[in-house]
UniProtKB/Swiss-Prot annotation:
Belongs to the universal ribosomal protein uS12 family. GO terms for biological process: translation. GO terms for cellular component: small ribosomal subunit. The gene is rpsL. HAMAP family: Ribosomal_uS12_B (MF_00403_B). This is Small ribosomal subunit protein uS12. Gene3D superfamilies: Nucleic acid-binding proteins. One of its GO terms (molecular function) is tRNA binding. Residues 104-123 are annotated as: Disordered.
Length: 123
């Protein structure tokens, strides 16, 4: 516990906020190349095959990112855009791939929440 005089002389140091998506380096999104596309299983109470990809970003960092939506066309060497946002039941997955940009096509036959999955307006 500091004394009043110590606080007057030095003052308190502000706590720094830790980034939840450090690989983006303060950018809203980053481009990268898929190095591996695979499925993985979620943590304990859940059961599924979640689609994920290892992505090497333009700044050289390699991250694991989630492929949202039903079905995808991604394979090795696909160029993708990633954004922050973790997947709660997949440990180590802190990024999402943005659907409908670069090599990633939008979700087919999507009627609701289309903007999140890069789907065009149905005719």
């Amino acid at each position: 516990m500091p004394t009043i005089n110590q606080l007057i002389r030095i003052g308190r140091e502000n706590k720094r906020d830790k980034s939840t998506a450090p690989a983006l380096k303060c950018c809203p999104q980053k481009r990268g190349v898929c190095t591996r596309v695979y499925t993985t299983t979620p943590k304990k109470p859940n059961s599924a095959l979640r689609k994920v990809a290892r992505v090497r970003l333009t700044n050289g960092i390699e991250v694991t990112s989630y492929i949202p939506g039903v079905g995808h066309n991604l394979q090795e060497h696909s160029v993708v855009l990633i954004r922050g946002g973790r997947v709660k039941d997949l440990p180590g997955v802190r990024y999402h791939i943005v659907r409908g940009t670069l090599d990633s096509v939008g979700v087919k036959d999507r009627k609701k929440s289309r903007s999140k999955y890069g789907a065009k307006r149905p005719k």
